[in-house]
Amino acid sequence: MARLSPLHLRVQCAIRQQQLLHPGQRLLVAFSGGQDSFCLLQILRDLQPRWGWQIFVLHCDHRWSADETECARFLQGWLQQQGLPHAVETADPIRRDEAGARAWRYQQLEKWARTWDCSAVVMGHTASDRAETFLWNLLRGTGAAGLSSLDWQRHLDDRDPTSAQVVRPLLGLYRWETEQFCQQHQLPVWPDRSNQDLAHGRNRLRLEVMPYLKQHFNPQLEAALNRAATLLQAEHELVVAQAAQLWPQVYEPALPGLRRDPLRAAPLALQRQVMFQFLSLVLPHHPTFEQVEAGIQLLKADRGSRSPDYPGGHWLEVKGDHLVCFH
């Protein structure tokens, strides 16, 4: 077995400490061809003899540009040359928005995780990505869940606890480290030219805003934002756990609805988490902050009071001691 570098050992330590992966697992690697995903794939391959993993690779071509399609062809050839089991998916129709592209990409990951019977989907997000996500979500407006959303692991489908785990073994590394690793190992990284397009707000944040903040406010900005995300993650997990304990006391599935008295007596943070969980069950999509707050207001409202209409023709109405969802 080849000797492991300090970077390999750091990633292996994170895998063990965070309990991300287990020996003998079948892994699906989300592979863009950029430096982070190349670094991830190489480290997993180097650790494979010690862990006995079976590694499968998926690349998604969004067809946003001719360059992206050329990248897909190049990566497919390289993966074939390496003898790695892989698939390349091409978007049809093309999803022009980030949210639509992400949803399509996750659909492909779910499909291939099932096809190859993979229990973990491994992604190459780094601490640099986590810092950017924290600041991006803060600027857009979000709570603790959004600020700490890029975590070490989560379910591929957050509504399905049986879905594969998304794991991020590189969250302890920064982007400059993955770049250095790829250079040292002469990996054929494909540069994503769209990452330089300042028309995309996320690119402007990464290329202009964060360097400015580092220069004028905090040279260790990425580390500071990662610490904040870690702290908020632990606090959010506490609220979620306490809300889970309260849930059987307030949820009435037959209605469906919530008992107002015990929920009204709970702290506001728990009220919001329970309301978010309830609305996520009855609505077609996760609720917004305003939709959660509309439900919270009804906990103290008079009988017969109702919320504004929610998506899908749903609304909440006070019926006695219950807050009931109608459709």
Curated annotation (Swiss-Prot):
Gene: tilS
Pfam families named among the record's database cross-references: ATP_bind_3
EC top class named in words: ligase
Entry keyword set: ATP-binding, Cytoplasm, Ligase, Nucleotide-binding, tRNA processing
GO MF terms, alphabetically ordered: ATP binding; tRNA(Ile)-lysidine synthase activity
Comment text on domains: The N-terminal region contains the highly conserved SGGXDS motif, predicted to be a P-loop motif involved in ATP binding.
Protein name (record): tRNA(Ile)-lysidine synthase
Family recorded in the similarity comment: Belongs to the tRNA(Ile)-lysidine synthase family.
Catalytic activity: cytidine(34) in tRNA(Ile2) + L-lysine + ATP = lysidine(34) in tRNA(Ile2) + AMP + diphosphate + H(+)
Subcellular location: Cytoplasm
Major localization class: cytoplasm
Function: Ligates lysine onto the cytidine present at position 34 of the AUA codon-specific tRNA(Ile) that contains the anticodon CAU, in an ATP-dependent manner. Cytidine is converted to lysidine, thus changing the amino acid specificity of the tRNA from methionine to isoleucine.
Enzyme Commission designation: 6.3.4.19
Keyword tRNA processing among record annotations: yes
UniProt: ATP binding residues: 32-37
NCBIfam families per the UniProt record, alphabetical: lysidine_TilS_N
GO BP annotation list: tRNA modification
Keyword rRNA-binding: no
GO cellular component, one term: cytoplasm
Source organism per UniProt: Synechococcus sp. (strain JA-2-3B'a(2-13))
